[in-house]
Regions:
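Charged DNA-binding/catalytic regions of mobile-element recombinases
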Residues: 1-246
Length: 246
């Protein structure tokens, strides 16, 4: 049973997620016993230390509406966004993503060979289309020129969003995205043995499968009651009579 769950997690689950999945299947086992069984079978969860990057220069008078409170009571209340990069044989590939703080899923993303305003606008456009164009969403990001650009401000304004930026030089003000990037790269490296890709096309295809199939729909999270982001969002819609919402 433990080996099966571990394999289905793509060899990434550690003890907490393993315990949660066993409990979901009706097996009431202690954390200590699971830890011993995993050690005995050399089943190790994906792990690495986080590396925080520095923030960017100030962005006018736009306030920080989150103040490091990375929680939401419902979908589409608070989104966080950022850009990271991967090295490929074709050169760098930049990934921009938008994460919903309620169910922790990625609602919008895109990749490109340049980290410009068009990239973050594309990720935002996907997020809006996927979620039914909600209004009054808080969109929180760092002060990179992509997010402070006129193109992005125009796109966010057309969607009636509230823009929010962390304080200058403090990456912890966007910690929810920083931790996602750390887990993304740790687990990709754990599964593939490397985060290097031969081509940008290969990297994009792999990121599509990892984000859309594995992370959003298969990877269970202890903070969500050991549900996946998709399951957690579906449960909220069912409990609140919003099955018609995307």
């Amino acid at each position: 049973m433990i080996r099966d769950i571990y394999a289905r997690s793509r060899n990434t689950y550690g003890v907490p997620r393993m315990v949660g999945q066993l409990h979901r299947r009706g097996h009431r086992v202690s954390r200590g016993r699971v830890a011993r069984l995993m050690r005995a079978n050399n089943l190790i969860g994906a792990h690495a230390s986080n590396k925080w990057r520095r923030g960017r220069p100030d962005a006018g008078g736009v306030p920080d509406l989150l103040q490091r409170n990375f929680r939401a009571d419902a979908p589409n209340q608070r989104w966080v966004a950022d850009i990271t990069e991967f090295v490929t044989g074709d050169g760098k590939l930049y990934l921009a993503a938008v994460r919903d703080l309620f169910h922790r899923g990625i609602v919008g993303w895109d990749t490109a060979g340049r980290q410009d305003a068009a990239l973050v606008v594309s990720a935002l456009t996907m997020a809006l289309a996927r979620t039914g164009h909600p209004t009054n969403v808080i969109h929180h990001a760092d002060k990179g020129t992509q997010y402070t650009s006129l193109d992005f401000a125009f796109a966010a304004g057309n969607a009636d969003m509230q823009l929010s930026f962390g304080s200058t030089g403090d990456a912890y003000d966007n910690a929810a995205m920083e931790t996602f990037w750390a887990r993304l790269k740790v687990e990709i490296a754990w599964i593939r043995g490397s985060i290097w890709f031969a081509t940008r096309a290969e990297a994009h295809a792999y990121l599509f499968e990892f984000i859309e199939v594995f992370y959003n729909r298969q990877r269970h999270q202890p903070g969500l009651g050991h549900l996946t982001p998709a399951e957690y969002a579906d449960k909220w819609r069912h409990d609140h009579g919003h099955q018609d919402l995307p």
